[in-house]
Amino acid sequence: MDKSLLLELPILLCCFRALSGSLSMRNDAVNEIVAVKNNFPVIEIVQCRMCHLQFPGEKCSRGRGICTATTEEACMVGRMFKRDGNPWLTFMGCLKNCADVKGIRWSVYLVNFRCCRSHDLCNEDL
């Protein structure tokens, strides 16, 4: 395992946040839970599964828990693959301005992000 790449993972997430589009501004944001209260639409909060490090075939090894996504956030699953397509690492949690993205190149890895707001712990199903 390349520890220097693991230490750079937060930098990758920060760069991704700066480049991604906002979930709430997307035209196809159909997974948001919207309730109408007193004739005003209200976006409900969503709880997300959180895990900072999970390797293939193993349980979550760091950062297991639940986070609460604000109206600007979504539940997210990030998966890193080696260039040959073999899975290397999975991480999940709440992410601001989340967007579904495939194939971001990061060193010798490819990274995919999937986002949801359809129900509590929806990122367990992605």
Curated annotation (Swiss-Prot):
UniProt superkingdom: Eukaryota
Family annotation (InterPro entries): LY6_UPA_recep-like
Main location: secreted
CDD domains (alphabetical): TFP_LU_ECD_PATE1
Ranges of residues in domain UPAR/Ly6: 46-125
GO molecular function: acetylcholine receptor regulator activity
Tissue: Expressed specifically in prostate cancer, normal prostate, and testis. Expressed in the epithelial cells of the prostate cancer and normal prostate tissues.
This protein's name: Prostate and testis expressed protein 1
Organism: Homo sapiens
